[in-house]
Amino acid sequence: ACIITLNEADRIDACLDSLAFCDEIVVVDSGSSDGTRERAMAKGARVLEHAFEGYRAQKDFVVNAAQHDWVLCLDADERVTPALRASIERERDGGFGHHAGYRCARLTEYFGAPLHHGNAYPDRVLRLFDRRRGGWRGNREIHEHASVDGAVAMLAGDLDHQAYRSLPDQLARLDRDPRLLAETPHA
């Protein structure tokens, strides 16, 4: 599994606990000052430090640091549910078939309430893929997405997404995200 972090000490334990079935967990941290790196190491993750150059670049870096060809990429505010874990393990045990990647339904929780309606669910995200056939591509610096060359299947089970810590956290993102979008070059 591959995770990028910056000051995620309050969330990293639950994320890593949900990945206990993975053969390897790599965390790339971009300068946390809250004990994130230490918590991740205590959970058995291999932790690397890398200066932040953008979300996509950071995710490419962690994928390239993995030792296995198949990688599961999560953000620190995400958790693999038991149903998703079972689905991933079934595919892994079957050799992943002819697929290059797998999507899962991400279920966002908004201050503890799951968003099952509207455009929020299912947010089908490609998070498990063969890194030889894909990665974090495109020119988007926020809401970046992985893509692969080859067939993509859908996994059963949800990826739990604990989007915001608090209302001030959400407001800070509403300030940050448009600036990042404005700085993203467009083709």
Where are the language model's segments positioned?
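Short acidic donor-binding/metal-coordinating loop in glycosyltransferase active sites
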Residues: S30, H50-F52, H68, D75-E78, ...
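Acidic helix N-cap motif at the loop->helix transition within catalytic regions
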Residues: D10-D13, D34-K43, A83-L84
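A conserved acidic beta->alpha catalytic loop
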Residues: S18, D29-R39, D75
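Conserved donor nucleotide-binding strand/loop of the catalytic core
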Residues: R37-A65
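Catalytic-site signature of metal-activated, phosphate-bearing donor transferases
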Residues: D60-V63, D69-W70, T81-A187
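Short, well-formed alpha-helical segments that are part of the catalytic scaffolds
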Residues: I3-F21
